[in-house]
């Protein structure tokens, strides 16, 4: 079938269950790429099979995926493992998009400002502006 793409481009936001095996995620990325889509993996920091494994993030990117993390996941103290992992993969240039996971304004409000302050130091223009603009225009990132 056809996937619902972003703004009529080849980009498609893909979400997996937190418990999905890495082999399932990897095969799905391959399938999307072979079908002509450009998958953006939503909130990869939640996937148990990927969390803490920079090598798997790299492999998914090399297979053709782009990586999106949630803004909330960047906001955490020094002992917050999720925030530490997200900051690490961002520092290594492995994050392409920042999302809010905001499904509505009553129960999940967007909280981009604190995360933007974390991102702003080095990657803000690319992650917050340039990559989303290029994606919406259907251009490569």
Where are these regions (language model features)?
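Mid-to-C-terminal alpha-helical segments outside catalytic/metal-binding sites
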Residues: 112, 117-141
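Active-site beta-loop-alpha junctions enriched in small/polar residues
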Residues: 17-19, 44-47, 70-76, 102-105, ...
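Short active-site-adjacent structural elements
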Residues: 75-79, 105-110, 136
């Amino acid at each position: 079938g056809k996937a619902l793409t972003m703004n009529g481009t080849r980009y498609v936001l893909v979400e997996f269950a937190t418990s999905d095996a890495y082999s399932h995620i990897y095969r799905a990325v391959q399938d999307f790429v072979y079908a002509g889509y450009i998958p953006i993996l939503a909130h990869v920091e939640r996937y148990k099979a990927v969390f803490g494994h920079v090598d798997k993030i790299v492999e998914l990117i090399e297979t053709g995926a782009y990586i999106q993390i949630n803004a909330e996941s960047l906001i955490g103290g020094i002992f917050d493992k999720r925030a530490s992992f997200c900051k690490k993969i961002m520092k290594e240039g492995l994050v392409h998009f920042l999302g809010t996971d905001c499904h509505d304004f009553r129960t999940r409000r967007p909280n981009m400002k604190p995360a933007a302050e974390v991102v702003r130091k080095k990657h803000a223009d690319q992650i917050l502006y340039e990559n989303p603009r290029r994606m919406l225009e259907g251009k490569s990132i």
